[in-house]
Amino acid sequence: MAAQIRWYGKGDLMTDYPTLALNDGRQLPQLGFGTYKIDEGDAPEAVKTALDVGYWLVDTAAIYQNERGVGKGVGDWSDIFLQTKIWNESQGFERTKKAADKCLERLGRDHVDMLLIHWPCPEKDLFVETWKAFIELRGEGKAKSIGVSNFREQDLRRIIDETGVTPALNQIELHPTFQQRELRKLHEELGIVTQCWSPLGQGAGIENETIAAIAEETGQPASAVILRWHMQHRLCPIPKASSRDHIEANFAALKFTLTDDQMARIDALDDPEGRIGPDPGDFEG
């Protein structure tokens, strides 16, 4: 899944915008704008700012309670890659179908570019039926692509084995101090794009001495260094930011490249026990 380059002439930081090939034949913008913890009232302006800077992928979720604001921020931009997620309480075939319609209503859209199952919730054991609903929603044109979030190897293999349909992507916690190498390797084998939530490690990575040193070497913001590391590993990070300064600092990841030595130094920060968020094997929401 090599990154491809597409020209996007938007914003003050106009640049080549890389994309990743999805297994359904579509292209995914490689750097996204996350909206976790952005209030409904603040979402329109934050999203408008991100689009003005140049982002072409916007991520939200039903549980974020800001889909209406995100939809307003996207406005009439028909070519923005918009994705949302179905929350845990909506799992199950019929509940998922209804929840997806509600997401579309809040977003003001008749479809989304990507629809994700937010968590597997293995104790509920409804994610296979939810995935079957996703397949039907894609067939109805309500989701152009379908994927999952926080799925483990056993979860991925089960939905593939039971439905024959492989998710286009799996959005997981991933940052320099929690690199999920085994799961990434599985994604490569299965043709699944790895999308990354909390790609900056909730800000901890920005304060890391190695990251700070590379930021000084490159003359780029520390956040951009981390996001560039993600991108050179063919990952799709979706950092959240609310101020224009931070949004632009993150977007600077498209303006430079890291050397092999710099990449290796960041690779060395990995900690298999460095998870910040919930363990998908235990989390039921």
Map each language-model feature to its residues.
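Alpha-helical scaffolding within the catalytic cores
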Residues: 15-20, 68, 99-102, 154-157, ...
